[in-house]
From Swiss-Prot:
Cofactors that this protein relies on: Zn(2+)
Protein name: N-acyl homoserine lactonase AttM
Known catalytic reactions: an N-acyl-L-homoserine lactone + H2O = an N-acyl-L-homoserine + H(+)
Binding-site positions, Zn(2+) 2: D107, H108, D202, H247
One Gene Ontology MF term: metal ion binding
Encoding gene, per UniProt annotation: attM
Family: Belongs to the metallo-beta-lactamase superfamily.
Length: 263
């Protein structure tokens, strides 16, 4: 497969509370959010963006994630794992050239170390923070997901490497968007027919965050979170990009899912 395409996929969902996603809202009401990940096919080699939940949580969530399951409970089947879904699309895992990480929280690390020829691209400050997170953030990082010997890593350096062009042809560009995590990055995807799409990932969980009507329930920096949304809004307006928020149970169903695609 050499056509440039964007596939939108989902590795199950997370059961939580509204206030985990929208700060100080919901009065303790239950909430369930999708866990998206993305595949870009390209003649130079394919890219996985994030990979969703590690497949191990489909069979042993508490054994893999520990106490964070008391807050975020994964609902996932084994066939919703990243590798299984990529294979179901007829793609050989050996043909994946890049695994690109928005950040290293537990619901975004399902592709790391699972594609034998892949270079893993992440912000350096995110990688370093994931090993020594502050006390309030520790539950969000599952070290065994990313602390894997023998992986090829490529580190980006915040504003110095902002708008890094993965393929060199404008198809996939990183956008540094810290706040939710210290080294968070979003992605601008430009497609020949569908045009630009802006994957905010967790810089904006939902359209409430995007429209500045709520703060996310988890963040590393409030100021950085707000400023990153403003940066992404400006980019979307300038490029005319369609906006894809990170964990939005209302907006996510409106997008085409694999085996459908954007091209």
């Amino acid at each position: 497969m050499t056509d440039i395409r964007l596939y939108m996929l989902q590795s199950g969902s997370l059961k939580c509370k509204v206030h985990n996603i929208k700060m100080n809202q919901g009065n303790g009401a239950d909430y369930e959010i999708p866990v998206p990940f993305f595949l870009i096919t390209h003649p130079k080699g394919h890219t996985i963006i994030d990979g969703g939940n590690a497949v191990e949580v489909a069979t042993d969530p508490r054994g893999h994630w520990g106490g964070v399951c008391d807050v975020y409970w994964p609902v996932m089947r084994e066939d919703e794992g990243c590798v299984a879904q990529v294979k179901a699309l007829g793609i050989d895992p050996a043909d994946v050239k890049y695994v690109v990480q928005s950040h290293l929280h537990l619901d975004h690390t399902g592709a790391i170390g699972r594609f034998p020829n892949a270079t893993h691209i992440v912000q350096r400050r995110e990688y370093e923070y994931a090993f020594t997170p502050d006390w309030f953030a520790g539950g969000g990082y599952i070290r065994k997901d990313f602390d894997r010997p023998g992986l090829r890593w490529q580190f980006l350096n915040a504003d110095v490497d902002d708008y890094y062009d993965i393929y060199g042809d404008g198809t996939l560009t990183t956008v540094f968007s810290p706040g939710h995590a210290p080294g968070h990055q979003s992605f601008l995807v430009r497609l020949p027919k569908s045009g630009p799409l802006l994957l905010t990932i967790d810089a904006a969980y939902t359209l409430d965050h995007w429209n500045e009507q709520a703060l996310p329930g988890f963040l590393a920096s409030t100021v950085d979170t707000v400023r990153s949304v403003q940066k992404l809004r400006t980019l979307a307006e300038r490029t005319g990009a369609q906006v894809v928020t990170g964990h939005d149970p209302d907006a996510w169903p409106s997008f085409k899912k694999a085996p459908g695609y954007y091209d």
